[in-house]
Regions:
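Membrane-integrated ABC transporters
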Residues: 1-47, 62-84, 99-103, 107, ...
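Short intracellular "coupling" helices and adjacent cytoplasmic loop segments at the cytosolic face
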Residues: 2-10, 108, 116-140, 144-148, ...
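Alpha-helical segments in transporter systems
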Residues: 20, 31-56, 81, 85, ...
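Transmembrane helices of ABC transporter permease
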Residues: 28, 32-45, 85, 91, ...
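Helix-loop-helix
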Residues: 64-65, 173-187, 257-330, 335-339
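An intracellular "coupling" helix at the cytosolic face of ABC transporter transmembrane type-1 domains
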Residues: 127-128, 144-153, 157, 161, ...
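ABC-type nucleotide-binding domain
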Residues: 352-614
Length: 614
């Protein structure tokens, strides 16, 4: 069986690298990014320059006060300077508005690319990956994690760059105005950075835990919703609530701590900044009183000193979004970096003709070999996880057109064998051949195209009945889909649906009975019409009357095809050419029905009721 699901979370190995990787996606909108960059520089120049322009205004006013004659202040000069200051502030606001609008477009375009690449990559992942991940954890990557990246790009990234530009501009101006006062500001800034950094590490840790716990909680909710019928049947509502409360409490605890430390950054940094500002005002005032600093420079420096810490405060206030986004991005990229399903096959599948004239061929270089459907296992050993072998030295041979049945208790290895035929997993020892060709040499897409499966858990998509049948072969015509439905004995119930074949199915076919869903799955396999069929407990959920009703159609469907059948009901395998009885991953008996009954072994006990499949 699959390995245990992952329940822990990993810290981002390199937050800077993760942020840089996000910027690589954003960089695909380079012209818009250039526009944002220009607007950020322009807004910084305007806002920083506006404060500096206060210096000549204040000095002129101070000179007039000292002279005792306000008329000495030129009205035109004063109005001109005030107009320049107003224009600079208006220009800064306009530039910020433009870059904000453009950055929103960049953010949505970037996250759209990330989601697309993530979904595309998911299609290439091996089943082993999904065995170790809950659906909730995977969905959390597409929703919460990517949404947090979008918020960071739309708000925090712009704030980060803008604050950096503003900080540099203010530093240059402060040094030019008064180096001694700047040194005081620098000391308090260093104290603030060290303090905020320590708080930020705590916040980052809890945000990572918050994201991981959210994924686990989503998985628990999804599992509970899907299994609600089972929960109610066994009266396990209290246990379900208790289980959810554990996940919910873990999420609450992590989220509370994360936001506590993130919220602590602002007040702490403000307190340190205000202390520094007071000291600068005191020292600067003394310099002004002693005549070593003019009044315009003093008040302009105070203005910059107040602004000096704003970029740092703004970054600190955005740490909530930044840490949450980086933690989520790490999870997204972790999934993106998961190795794709390996496929070194070179043999391809070629199909010619249609209908009765359809022919299947293996194309091995220049050699074309007809597909017969002969499958052989030769001393196959397999384990989902290295420490637990689930199939031991399995050897079997299915000739063209034969029906091979697997019988055994749950966990005996029946479904695992069919998974290996499809190469959903690779074996550790032995070989599996298809028409004498090692399946490792066949391209996986072509190998699976030559097979059709009716899975134990029938899955239908939110689409019409017709499109769900057509999923077996996307180029199938409506007529071929209807013919397949008739073959599977699904046509009669489909006609009684409100819109017939155009009836829209709800999630996973929830508006159909289990038997009807199973019939559609069989019709889907029928429209594919490949040389090999795998029926994994295909009729276990269909009532006896329905099962008898489709037997004739299934016999016609399997005619001339190699078929592997797993069924709970032994009546469905009696006509098989060979029956393999499995126990603990080993074939303990093999032969047709009559031969196995004559042996009076395990199969005989199952058929006579002396033993059960459970």
């Amino acid at each position: 069986m699959p390995g245990p699901r992952r329940t822990d979370f990993k810290k981002p190995k390199n937050a800077t690298k993760t942020f840089g990787r996000i910027l690589q996606y954003a960089g695909k909108s380079k012209f818009m990014l250039l526009a944002v960059f220009v607007m950020l520089i322009a807004s910084t120049v305007c806002s920083v320059g506006a404060s500096y322009w206060l210096k000549p205004i204040l000095n002129d006013i101070d000179a007039s006060i000292r002279a005792g004659n306000f008329a000495t202040v030129g009205v035109q000069s004063l109005m001109r300077n005030l107009a320049i200051v107003s224009a600079l502030y208006i220009g800064a606001s306009l530039c910020m508005y433009i870059q904000s609008k453009v950055m929103v477009k960049i953010a949505y375009k970037t996250t759209n690319l990330i989601r697309k690449e993530l979904f595309d990559h998911m299609q290439t992942l091996p089943l082993r990956f999904f065995d170790t991940q809950t659906h909730g954890e995977i969905m959390s990557r597409y929703t919460n994690d990517v949404d947090n990246i979008q918020m960071m790009l739309e708000q925090s990234m712009v704030q980060l760059v803008s604050s950096a530009f503003t900080f540099v501009g203010i530093v240059v101006m402060m040094i030019a105005l008064s180096p001694p006062l700047f040194c005081i500001s620098l000391v308090f800034m260093i104290i603030m950075l060290v303090t905020v950094s320590k708080i930020g590490k705590k916040s980052k840790h809890y945000f990572q835990a918050q994201q991981a716990n959210l994924g686990q909680m989503n998985g628990n909710i999804e599992e509970s919703v899907e299994g609600m019928r089972v929960i109610k049947v066994f009266n396990h509502e209290d246990q379900a609530i208790a289980g959810f409360e554990q996940y919910n409490e873990a999420f609450r605890s992590a989220a509370t701590n994360a936001n506590f430390y993130a919220g602590l950054m602002g007040p702490v940094s403000n307190g340190i900044n205000n202390a520094g500002y007071a000291l600068i005002a005191l020292f600067g005032g003394l310099l002004a009183l002693t005549g070593r600093l003019d009044i315009g420079t003093f008040f302009t420096f105070l203005s910059y000193a107040k602004q000096f810490t704003q970029p740092i405060n703004q970054i600190a206030n955005q740490m909530n979004t930044i840490f949450s986004a980086l933690a989520g991005a790490e999870r997204v990229f972790e999934m993106m970096d998961t190795a794709s399903e390996e496929d070194q096959g070179t043999v391809t599948l070629t199909v010619t003709g249609a209908g009765e004239e359809k022919r299947w061929y293996w194309q091995d270089g220049d050699r074309r070999v007809p597909v017969h459907g002969a499958v052989e296992f030769h001393h196959v050993t397999f384990a989902y996880v290295p420490e637990k072998v689930v199939l031991h030295d399995i050897s079997l041979y299915a000739k063209e057109g034969q029906k091979i049945a697997f019988v055994g208790s749950t966990g005996a290895g029946k479904t695992t064998i069919t998974n290996l035929i499809n190469r959903f997993y690779d074996i550790q020892e032995g070989t599996i051949t298809y028409d004498g060709i090692d399946i490792c040499r066949i391209k996986k897409d072509d190998l699976r195209r030559s097979l059709a499966m009716v899975l134990q858990d029938t899955h239908l998509f939110t689409d019409t009945v017709m499109e769900n049948i057509r999923y077996g072969r996307l180029d199938a015509t409506d007529e071929e889909c209807i013919a397949a439905a008739k073959l599977a004995s699904a046509h009669s119930f489909i006609r009684r649906l409100p819109e017939g074949y155009q009836t829209m199915l709800t999630g996973d076919g929830g508006n159909l009975s289990q038997g009807q869903r199973q019939l559609l799955a069989i019709a889907r396999a029928a429209v594919a019409d490949p040389p090999v069929m795998v029926l994994d407990e295909a009729t276990s959920s269909i009532d006896t009357r329905t099962e008898k009703h489709i037997e004739h159609g299934m016999d016609r469907l399997m005619a001339g095809k190699t078929t592997f059948v797993i069924a709970h009901r032994l009546s469905t395998v009696r006509e098989s050419n060979a029956i393999m009885v499995l126990e603990d991953g080993r074939i303990i008996e093999r032969g047709d029905h009559n031969a196995l009954m004559a042996q009076q072994g395990r199969y005989y006990q199952l058929c006579t009721g002396k033993a059960k499949l459970s």
